Curated annotation (Swiss-Prot):
Reactions catalysed according to its record: L-lysine + 2-oxoglutarate = (S)-2-amino-6-oxohexanoate + L-glutamate
Regions that span the bilayer: none
Cofactor: pyridoxal 5'-phosphate
Binding site for 2-oxoglutarate: R170, Q274, R422
Family membership noted in the UniProt record: Belongs to the class-III pyridoxal-phosphate-dependent aminotransferase family.
Entry text on domains: Contains a Glu-243 'switch' that allows the enzyme to change substrate preferences in the two half-reactions. The unique substrate L-lysine is recognized specifically when Glu-243 maintains a salt bridge with Arg-422. On the other hand, the binding of the common C5 substrates L-glutamate and alpha-ketoglutarate is enabled when Glu-243 switches away and unshields Arg-422.
Quaternary structure annotation from Swiss-Prot or TrEMBL: Homodimer.
Additional free-text comment from the UniProt record: Was identified as a high-confidence drug target. Various compounds targeting the LAT enzyme have been identified as potential anti-tuberculosis agents.
Name of encoding gene: lat
Induction of expression: 42-fold induced by starvation. Expression is regulated by the HTH-type transcriptional regulator LrpA.
Enzyme class: transferase
Name the record gives this protein: L-lysine-epsilon aminotransferase
Organism placement in taxonomy: Bacteria, Bacillati, Actinomycetota, Actinomycetes, Mycobacteriales
GO biological process per UniProt: antibiotic biosynthetic process; gamma-aminobutyric acid catabolic process
Organism, as annotated: Mycobacterium tuberculosis (strain ATCC 25618 / H37Rv)
Length: 449
C-alpha cells in the first residue's frame, strides 16, 4: 500500500495573514491592494481582509474577471461540482492532446451560452493577451493565404490596424497595439503598425461633430490601407476601450470599419476580454453594435481565455482552425478553470444574469446621473452599457484622490485613462449594493473638491 505523503510546514513561523505581504515581498514586487483576501469569509460583492476582518464593497471584481462575485452559493453549495473541481485540480492534462468529459461539457456549455453560430471555431489558451495574440496569428495566416490565392506575395499580411488609447495586453504582438501608459510598453521592442484616432463619444459633441471625428479616423484608416497595399491583415478594437478610459463608440464607426476591412480584404477582430460574458448586458458587446466580426478574443469572466472565429476566416479553407498545430499550447486552457467556467455559465444562464445586467446597469447609470446633477463641476460624463459604467473627474489628481477616499470608506473601484473611475461589479450585484457604492462616492466628493 502506498504511503500517504502529507503536506509538511517548513521550519519557521507559519504564514499567517499578517505575514503575507512580508513573505511575498522577499521574492516579488508587492504593489497590489493593501488587503489580504480571506477566501473563506469573502462573499458576493464583498471582499474580507483576513488581517482586519474589514469588509470591502467590491466594484472591481479582480479587474472585471469575477462574474458571480466571491463564493457564490450556487457553487459553494454544489457538492457534485466540488467533486468535479477537485478531480480536475488533482491533475493538469494537456487539453490540446488528451480530451476529457470535463472539457467536452465546458465547450458544449460555452457554445450554448456564449457562442455565435457565425463564429463556430473555438481556441482556448491561458491569458487574455494570448487570446488576442492568437487572434492576430489567425489573421496573419489568413491574409498571407488569401494573398497567395490571388497572386499576391504571401510574405505580405504582417500589419495590424488599431486605435489610439487601446489596451490589448502585454505579450509580444500585443505590446505593439497597447498604448495606454508608457510604463507598460516603454523599452520593449515593438512593431511599427498603423495606429488611428479613436473617435469615441464625449460630452459636448453633437452629431455633426461626432461624424467629423469618425470621418477623420476613417480617412486615416483608408490611408493606412492604401499606403500598405495587401499588408494589413486585420483591424482590432475593443468595442468599449476599458483601460483607455471607458471610451464608447457609435455603431456607425465600426460599421464603416467593417466595410473598409471588406474592401481591403482584412479581418475585423473585436477584443472582448473585458467587455464580454454579459458585463454590457449581452453575451458580447458587439451584439449591441450591429457589426459582425470575423474573430472575437475573450477572457476574464470566461475564466478560460481564447478566440471565436468564422465568417471571412472560412473563405480560406486551410485556415489555422483547419490545419493542425498552427495554433496550439500545452494546456489549451486549464481544465480546472473549464470546470469552474462551465458551472458559472450554467448559473448565468439559469438566473438570467445577462438580463439582470441590463436592468441593474440602468439603475447604476441612473444613480451616476444623479451624482452628476448634484456635483456638475466634478462628476463628468457618466456613461455605461449594462454594468460597465464609469464617470470622469476634472483632473487625474481628483480621480486618484476619490479612489483613495473610497478605499478609506471600504469601497474598491478602478481607475481608467487619465481621469476616469470605472465600476466593474459582478453580474449578481444588488441595487442595495449599488446604493452603498453611490453613497460612498457622494460622501467622498466634498473631500475631493
Amino acid at each position: 500500500m502506498a504511503a500517504v505523503v502529507k503536506s509538511v510546514a517548513l521550519a519557521g513561523r507559519p504564514t499567517t495573514p499578517d505575514r503575507v505581504h512580508e513573505v511575498l515581498g522577499r521574492s516579488m514586487l508587492v504593489d497590489g491592494l493593501d488587503i489580504v483576501l480571506d477566501l473563506t469569509r469573502s462573499g458576493g460583492s464583498y471582499l474580507v481582509d483576513a488581517i482586519t476582518g474589514r469588509r470591502y464593497l467590491d466594484m472591481f471584481t479582480f479587474v472585471a474577471s469575477s462574474a458571480l462575485g466571491m463564493n457564490p452559493p450556487a457553487l459553494v453549495d454544489d457538492r457534485e461540482f466540488h467533486a468535479e473541481l477537485m478531480q480536475a485540480a488533482l491533475n493538469k492534462p494537456s487539453n490540446s492532446d488528451v480530451y476529457s468529459v470535463a472539457m467536452a461539457r465546458f465547450v458544449e456549455t460555452f457554445a450554448r451560452v456564449l457562442g455565435d453560430p457565425a463564429l463556430p471555431h473555438l481556441f482556448f489558451v491561458e491569458g487574455g493577451a494570448l487570446a488576442v495574440e492568437n487572434a492576430l496569428k489567425a489573421a496573419f495566416d489568413w491574409k498571407s493565404r488569401h494573398n497567395q490565392a490571388h497572386g499576391i506575395d504571401p510574405a505580405l499580411g504582417t500589419q495590424v490596424l488599431h486605435l489610439r488609447g487601446a489596451f490589448h495586453g502585454r505579450s509580444g504582438y500585443t505590446l505593439s497595439l497597447t498604448n495606454t501608459k508608457p510604463t507598460i510598453t516603454a523599452r520593449f521592442p515593438k512593431f511599427d503598425w498603423p495606429r488611428i484616432d479613436a473617435p469615441y463619444m464625449r460630452p459636448g459633441l453633437d452629431e455633426p461633430a461626432m461624424a467629423a471625428l469618425e470621418a477623420e479616423a476613417l480617412r486615416q484608416a483608408r490611408a493606412a490601407f492604401e499606403t500598405r497595399p495587401h499588408d494589413i491583415a486585420c483591424f482590432v478594437a475593443e468595442p468599449i476601450q476599458g483601460e483607455g478610459g471607458d471610451r464608447h463608440f457609435r455603431p456607425e464607426f465600426f460599421a464603416a470599419m467593417r466595410e473598409l476591412c471588406d474592401e481591403f480584404d482584412a479581418l475585423l477582430i473585436f477584443d472582448e476580454v473585458q467587455t464580454g460574458c454579459g458585463l454590457t448586458g449581452t453575451a458580447w458587446a458587439y451584439q449591441q453594435l450591429d457589426v459582425a466580426p470575423d474573430i472575437v478574443a475573450f477572457g476574464k469572466k470566461t475564466q478560460v481565455c481564447g478566440v471565436m472565429a468564422g465568417r471571412r476566416v472560412d473563405e480560406v479553407a486551410d485556415n489555422v482552425f483547419a490545419v493542425p498545430s498552427r495554433l496550439n499550447s500545452t494546456w489549451g486552457g486549464n481544465l480546472t478553470d473549464m470546470v469552474r467556467a462551465r458551472r458559472i455559465l450554467e448559473v448565468i444562464e439559469a438566473e438570467g444574469l445577462f438580463e439582470r445586467a441590463v436592468q441593474h446597469g440602468k439603475y447604476l447609470r441612473a444613480r451616476l446621473d444623479e451624482l452628476a446633477a448634484d456635483f456638475p463641476a466634478v462628476v463628468l460624463d457618466p456613461r455605461g452599457r449594462g454594468l460597465m459604467c464609469a464617470f470622469s473627474l476634472p483632473t487625474t489628481a481628483d480621480r486618484d484622490e476619490l479612489i483613495r477616499q473610497l478605499w478609506q470608506r471600504a469601497v474598491i473601484v478602478l481607475p481608467a485613462g487619465a481621469d476616469t473611475v470605472r465600476f466593474r461589479p459582478p453580474l449578481t450585484v444588488s441595487t442595495a449594493e449599488i446604493d452603498a457604492a453611490i453613497a460612498a462616492v457622494r460622501s467622498a466628493l466634498p473631500v475631493v473638491t
